[in-house]
Amino acid sequence: MSIDVIFLGLDGVLFDTEPPHLAACNAAFATAGLSVRWDARALRKAAATHGYARAINGALPPNLPARDKKRANDMADDKHREFHHAIVTAPPKALPAALALINDAIADGCKICIVTDLPAAAASALLSNAFGTDVNSLFTVVTGGASFDGAPGTGPYARALHAIGVQPSDAIAIDAGTPALRAAEEAGLWTVSIAPAQHGAEVVRPRQFITYEALRELHDSPFSHQAPHQASQIASPRQLAA
């Protein structure tokens, strides 16, 4: 089986956006009049569940009263504005290991797509600063503001694969957020998680980014593959352990 498409997230995958996300969350807390302040560990813990773009939701109770929803939405909007201002003022550079994977994959004939739940304007700012006019030549599809909450087969991964004519079994998604990884798995893609890991009381990020060569070895391993499913069934989630 081939790797025809690799989907990359932006947060924690192509860019280290942790510092601006942390600053944006704390600024939004302050604007909302909340006393809570996060450190990097708290942000990573929330991001592991909600993704970095919506990590601030980790500060909210699971069943938010209706009267508080507008305040919560305003806080999320404030966070997005603070984040956008931060990445425009001090643009983060693309991570070297991710760039190496992109270059190796493209050299092997693989398409690279971007799917992120960051607002489209923020995604555009990050990519434009890092790649300039090469964005359209490097990335086959760029989707910002993606929603990962839809029914399986209807989300951003399924739409992108349909547009470029690739089967889910020939595509891999690499992300640091559970919502994106879950949506990719439900769409039948292989997935690689580089999400922050829980080690006792500590939440830490992976030390290494997977290489394209390692990705191919994992994908081609007979231990990674399951028996074929009938065409009428949705492919079972398949996760490659980096």
Give residue spans per PLM region.
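N-terminal helical cap/lid subdomain that shapes the substrate entry/recognition surface
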Residues: 3-96, 107
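A broad detector of the eukaryotic-type serine/threonine protein kinase catalytic domain
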Residues: 61, 84, 88, 110, ...
